[in-house]
Amino acid sequence: MSVAGLKKQFYKASQLVSEKVGGAEGTKLDDDFKEMEKKVDLTSKAVTEVLTRTIEYLQPNPASRAKLTMLNTMSKIRGQVKNPGYPQSEGLLGESMIRYGKELGEDSNFGDALLDAGESMKRLAEVKDSLDIEVKQNFIDPLQNLCDKDLKEIQHHLKKLEGRRLDFDYKKKRQGKIPDEELRQAMEKFEESKEVAETSMHNLLETDIEQVSQLSALVDAQLDYHRQAVQILDELAEKLKRRMREASSRPRREYKPKPRETYDFGESDQSNGGFSCTPTPKVSASSSFRSDKPFRTSVRSIPHLDQPCCKALYDFEPENDGELGFKEGDIITLTNQIDENWYEGMINGQSGFFPLNYVEVLVPLPQ
């Protein structure tokens, strides 16, 4: 730095100290200038804040944003043209739905519905990617350019103006001790910088319709995204409702328990002093009151075992009309399965309903 430059820096520093510490009065700028400066400062803060919040709106996960920034930097270093995109939450949800939909298989209503929903979520992610690109091109990039160019240039002019004001005020305070020509030059430079700064701020504020246009582009992009999203979700909702209608119109598949294996070991003499093996009967609430009586198997109306029948495991006392009563050990002819809990059968010429869990199926009903 030249001697003249060092002297100028000393003048400005000295004037700044006298104003901050000594309370010296500096040259006042007019109210119109200060009002423009205030509006420009607010514009700068607004643009910076809106840019930050827009990026957070499009890419809400900070960890994913940081990772994406790192990957984009690495791609530039490696000279890769295509950069990885932001992992949209709709896409991640869709991948999860599709994975489990495939695992559940086509036999599952839920699995098929998950596949439908997963494909729709992936379509939503693609639409969201398009929104990101559209907003970046027509909103984020223009505002970023405003920050990097116009606002930065205004800040440069204001900083230069402040420096020349300090230089001018220092020399004005020492009027008579410095040449008049030097004071005149300092005043002219100050006035020149003020005019340049004033012009640049005026141009920015008068052309703020450009920012309105950019904001309109943001809203248009959002509208387009939401229209497509509504269309995708409407189609998905209709698919799911159609699946529900189809499922409700199909006959319900009744659960058919496999018949239990029965063992009938007759008494036989063993050459080695063997024993007879008979299964221990299950004890029911009703049979517990008859525990002093010997176990017996009913011989009433025993049907041929070539027709559907079952064996009573417990006593059943009918409580309602249409129910069929029986005793433990009775053999009951099966005529129909009402639902997953009740059979219809006959014994001793009487027919009625009885609970499935009171009997053991010997010969199941035909499918």
Swiss-Prot record:
InterPro entries: AH/BAR_dom_sf (IPR027267), BAR_dom (IPR004148), Endophilin_A_SH3 (IPR035824), Endophilin_SH3RF (IPR050384), SH3-like_dom_sf (IPR036028), SH3_domain (IPR001452). It comes from the Eukaryota. Residues 268-289 have a biased composition (Polar residues). Residues 181-250 form a coiled coil. It is found in: Cytoplasm; Early endosome membrane; Cell projection, Podosome. Highest level in central region of the theca of developing follicles (at protein level). Expressed at highest level in brain and testis, at high level in kidney, lung and stroma, low level in spleen and adrenal gland (at protein level). Expressed in most tissue with highest levels in small ovarian follicles, brain and testis. GO terms for molecular function: lipid binding. One of its GO terms (biological process) is endocytosis. Residues 243-293 are annotated as: Disordered. Residues 60-87 are annotated as: Required for dimerization upon membrane association. Residues 18-249 form the BAR domain. Its main location: cytoplasm. An N-terminal amphipathic helix, the BAR domain and a second amphipathic helix inserted into helix 1 of the BAR domain (N-BAR domain) induce membrane curvature and bind curved membranes. Implicated in endocytosis. May recruit other proteins to membranes with high curvature. This is Endophilin-A2. It comes from Gallus gallus (Chicken). The gene is SH3GL1.
